Curated annotation (Swiss-Prot):
Cell location: Golgi apparatus, trans-Golgi network membrane; Cell membrane; Secreted; Endosome membrane
Tissue expression profile of the protein: Seems to be expressed ubiquitously.
The protein's name: Furin
This protein's record includes keyword Plastid: no
Record-listed substrate binding positions: 154, 191-192, 236, 253-258, 264, 292-295, 306, 308, 368
Binding site for Ca(2+) 2: 174, 179, 181
Organism whose genome encodes this protein: Homo sapiens (Human)
SMART domains given in the database record: FU
One GO process term, biological-process aspect: peptide hormone processing
Residues engaged in binding Ca(2+) 3: 258, 301, 331
E.C. no: 3.4.21.75
Membrane topology, from the record: Single-pass type I membrane protein
One GO term describing the cellular component: membrane raft
Length: 794
């Protein structure tokens, strides 16, 4: 019995070698698809296909259709005559042919770019393998062709000689000035050069004798001018939602202040733009948002306090120096997914790219330079497989990133054997590995979301608090998860000095994520209000079992606070089973890559599969959807599972007012069908028993005291405080006047009729601030009169 797997492996390997040898010798290799001519329209073709166990992949043109059969070997040296004969005997079939695999090669001849600065782009062409392996992707023929990237920043110099050839006006807009032109505003200090620099990293034109090359040098590049003015929630949302069925990738190298004390993230509109982007962008495959993790390392900042990099919808990218070290500006956190190269110390090279005023620079720096490099690599990967979803891309990053050559003292092995670091995520992006894996990638199962309320009552944090909870990851429910992607700890807590807190989350498989490290500059007493700390470190782990939350006071001070809410939110996928046969999946029309685009009646499209019931968090809706053919993008109307509004748990539609149920932290308004978040102050107290009635005279006394104390005590205290301050001021004033020889006779302290304050009884030299005193007595008098002037001004 032990030999059977080996025998199967040997047989499979032998068959593969035979096919390869036959292909090399020019023999025909038959596939499991047929081209069939059937007059009468798609309905007749579908009927014939179903009758004989075929699936109609769609109309080729005219009366010609593309049939597929799952029971036929995908590649064979001989045709499948029984299936062919039965189909041929069908009277509606006028012609058919089993399709033969043909050898086709791209006519690109790969040569290294000839641009003058290319040899200095060490991160693309490293001689010691310390690079992003981009040339391996280029050698496979992928240069970003057909992919559109937009830089959300301070504009893009669209007429730059190294950008103009790839500039895409459809991926550009000026949100600051409300016009289509993203040209940056020029200043003497070149303040608005950031976006142009980022754009060159992605798609600088190759072999034009100018500067260097972009990672995806045949991609289309655009820019959104949105940072050169007031940045509001509306500005961010408009930028994130620009032309989502044209733009594939959005690259952003900005965020809240990296000062080590700010906790901030996207507001309502921007959060909605993210959600709409991943659920509706790219025809439902999801927009890809690439984000720089932050430059607050010197301030001991944490990128988990940045709600943009901490979002499950963004692909957060950190930096490594030329020699593979953690840069001084880098922030460590558990939401970072991967790393690219950037600047480091003075003896390490920086990034070469386009610069403002049609120039070139060799000194682009920070995580601002890392995110565009990642966007370029993702563009190469999308060219290899345009059907990748936004979550597919994150899976590819996790599976192909390389920890090698990166130095850090916190590398750990998670529960599925992958190395992961808070400084680097899963390691350096590998462009060659990503495009190779993407070509035959199978779309991940639909995302599931499991919400678990952990706390039943508030808990005192003290010096150290540990909360343990064993969970089943929604076992027995439609949203049961067995393979984890993102995990969030949504915390509400109070603390007198937030920066002294360190928070960790330990998964059932033992992976310990640092959700928050101590931030010495954060003196805030605001705590956290339903803040979602996110970790990617347990990717692909089984989330069932005991989770442990650790909250620790890292200082010696006797700090105090209370944890009032802890919700564990798990995102992942269902158990992997056998693939559903396409004939019984409810799919009506597939693309050439066998991705479903139209479902039969009674089914809705969800993540390229047809389902009779949309999963929790989605509702059926008829929408215009887009899918890519070989040469174009087609628009069709189809029933799809549209995501609920971000505030709803379940819904009957995508609008804010379509909620059917709410998350645990919100309540449903049955009239407006909206979910409103509950605050601590708005929650009703439990009913209490009525106290026994007191005698009338006692009750009257209590009413008298209650009427005086609760309602008037603040006013009384405020009045007494003001009177005391005035008394102290008058006393000090009089004492100083007496010490100065002040006389009360004939004093006129001030006049207000001309808006002036004139002092009497003071020597004239007291007002001559520029004149030096002739004696210590005059100096003392000058100090005192200065004090009086200050107090009078008050």
């Amino acid at each position: 019995m032990e030999l059977r797997p080996w025998l199967l492996w040997v047989v499979a390997a032998t068959g593969t070698l035979v096919l390869l040898a036959a292909d090399a010798q020019g023999q025909k290799v038959f596939t499991n698809t047929w081209a069939v001519r059937i007059p009468g329209g798609p309905a007749v073709a579908n009927s014939v296909a179903r009758k004989h166990g075929f699936l109609n992949l769609g109309q080729i043109f005219g009366d010609y259709y593309h049939f597929w059969h799952r029971g036929v070997t995908k590649r064979s040296l001989s045709p499948h005559r029984p299936r062919h004969s039965r189909l041929q005997r069908e009277p509606q079939v006028q012609w058919l042919e089993q399709q033969v695999a043909k050898r086709r090669t791209k006519r690109d001849v790969y040569q290294e770019p000839t641009d003058p600065k290319f040899p200095q782009q060490w991160y693309l062409s490293g001689v010691t393998q310390r690079d992003l392996n981009v040339k391996a992707a280029w050698a496979q023929g992928y240069t970003g062709h057909g992919i559109v990237v937009s830089i959300l920043d301070d504009g893009i110099e669209k007429n730059h000689p190294d950008l103009a050839g790839n500039y895409d006006p459809g991926a550009s807009f000026d949100v600051n000035d409300q016009d289509p032109d993203p040209q940056p505003r020029y200043t003497q200090m070149n303040d608005n050069r950031h976006g142009t620099r980022c754009a060159g990293e992605v798609a600088a034109v190759a072999n034009n004798g100018v500067c260097g090359v972009g990672v995806a040098y045949n991609a289309r590049i655009g820019g959104v001018r949105m940072l050169d003015g007031e940045v509001t929630d509306a500005v961010e949302a408009r930028s994130l939602g620009l032309n989502p069925n044209h733009i594939h990738i959005y690259s952003a190298s900005w965020g809240p202040e990296d000062d080590g004390k700010t906790v901030d993230g996207p507001a309502r509109l921007a959060e909605e733009a993210f959600f709409r982007g991943v659920s509706q962008g790219r025809g439902g495959l999801g927009s890809i948002f690439v984000w720089a993790s932050g430059n607050g390392g010197r301030e001991h900042d944490s990128c988990n306090c940045d709600g943009y990099t901490n979002s499950i919808y963004t692909l957060s990218i950190s930096s490594a120096t030329q020699f593979g070290n953690v840069p001084w500006y880098s922030e460590a956190c558990s939401s970072t997914l991967a790393t690219t190269y950037s600047s480091g110390n003075q003896n390490e090279k920086q990034i070469v790219t386009t610069d403002l005023r049609q120039k070139c620079t060799e000194s682009h720096t920070g995580t601002s330079a890392s995110a565009p490099l990642a966007a370029g690599i993702i563009a190469l990967t999308l060219e290899a497989n345009k059907n990748l979803t936004w979550r597919d891309m994150q899976h590819l990053v996790v599976q192909t990133s390389k920890p090698a050559h990166l130095n850090a003292n916190d590398w750990a092995t998670n529960g599925v054997g992958r190395k992961v670091s808070h400084s680097y995520g899963y390691g350096l992006l590998d462009a060659g590995a990503m495009v190779a894996l993407a070509q035959n990638w199978t779309t991940v199962a639909p995302q599931r979301k499991c919400i678990i309320d952990i706390l039943t009552e508030p808990k005192d944090i003290g010096k150290r608090l540990e909360v343990r909870k064993t969970v089943t990851a929604c076992l027995g429910e439609p949203n049961h998860i067995t393979r984890l992607e993102h995990a969030q700890a949504r915390l509400t807590l109070s603390y007198n000095r937030r920066g002294d807190l360190a928070i960790h989350l330990v998964s059932p498989m033992g992976t310990r994520s640092t959700l928050l490290a101590a931030r010495p500059h954060d003196y805030s007493a605001d705590g956290f209000n339903d803040w979602a700390f996110m970790t990617t470190h347990s990717w692909d782990e089984d989330p069932s079992g005991e989770w442990v939350l650790e909250i620790e006071n890292t200082s010696e001070a006797n700090n105090y606070g209370t944890l009032t809410k802890f919700t564990l939110v798990l995102y992942g996928t269902a158990p992997e089973g056998l693939p559903v046969p396409p004939e019984s999946s409810g799919c009506k029309t597939l693309t050439s890559s066998q991705a479903c685009v139209v479902c039969e009646e009674g089914f809705s499209l969800h993540q390229k599969s047809c389902v009779q019931h949309c999963p929790p968090g989605f509702a059926p809706q008829v929408l215009d959807t887009h899918y890519s053919t070989e040469n174009d993008v087609e628009t069709i109307r189809a029933s799809v599972c549209a995501p609920c509004h971000a505030s709803c748990a379940t819904c009957q539609g995508p609008a804010l007012t379509d909620c059917l149920s709410c998350p645990s932290h919100a309540s449903l308004d049955p009239v407006e069908q909206t979910c409103s978040r509950q605050s601590q102050s708005s929650r009703e107290s439990p009913p209490q028993q009525q106290p026994p009635r007191l005698p009338p005279e006692v009750e009257a006394g209590q009413r008298l005291r209650a009427g005086l104390l609760p309602s008037h005590l603040p006013e009384v205290v405020a009045g007494l405080s003001c009177a005391f301050i005035v008394l102290v001021f008058v006393t000090v004033f009089l004492v100083l006047q007496l010490r100065s020889g002040f006389s009360f006779r004939g004093v006129k302290v001030y006049t207000m009729d001309r808006g002036l304050i004139s002092y009497k009884g003071l020597p004239p030299e007291a007002w001559q601030e520029e004149c030096p005193s002739d004696s210590e007595e005059d100096e003392g008098r000058g100090e005192r009169t200065a004090f009086i002037k200050d107090q009078s001004a008050l």
